[in-house]
Amino acid sequence: AWRRNDTGIAAGNAGMVIRPEQPTVADMFRECGYTTGAIGKWHLGLSDRTGGQDWNGFITPGPSDIGFDYSYIMAATGDRVPCVWVENQRIVNLDPNDPIEVSYEKPFPGEPLGKDHPELLTKLKPSPNHGHDMAIVNGISRIGYMKGGKQALWEDENIADSITCKAVRFIENHKDEPFFLYVGTNDAHVPRWPHPRFVGKSGMGPRGDALLQFDWTVGE
């Protein structure tokens, strides 16, 4: 949204907002000999067009095409499908016998939706004013529709741990050489479902607990 005037809030299957021919800070660092990485919330799109992703193969163009040597990212945000990690442009833990399908136009037959099945929402209730009443993943309804990829789905309470672990490992692996690392946390972004060790600890509700979790990530 910040990079091009014709881009609003990107769907989870949007094409990449920053085109490969556009120079980036990551490109500049890489050209100067830095090892570059992008970890966490992405929401800049993947592939060359909306709906053009091969979710079950190598997704391109992607972070490697705009300057990043390594990437471990969400396709978009925590509240949009697909709810999976994408490492170096391939979905992590994907079972080829359970391929992923994604749509932002219509639901998949037989897949329950938050607006129709509130009894399946074991964590957060649907928020139809913002579109959070579609596909159900990890007991939370999302924006958009998806099916398959059950083995690859993230657990919201572990998102911060996943991002932090990957970021710390990247830093440790490259501490003796120049590196540039972009880390995008998802803590304050909906659905805000922090790890149990932070729940109720801030005294300021779920958002406060999520910010406490963010503080932990920065500290690590």
Language model features with spans:
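Formylglycine-dependent sulfatase
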Residues: 1-220
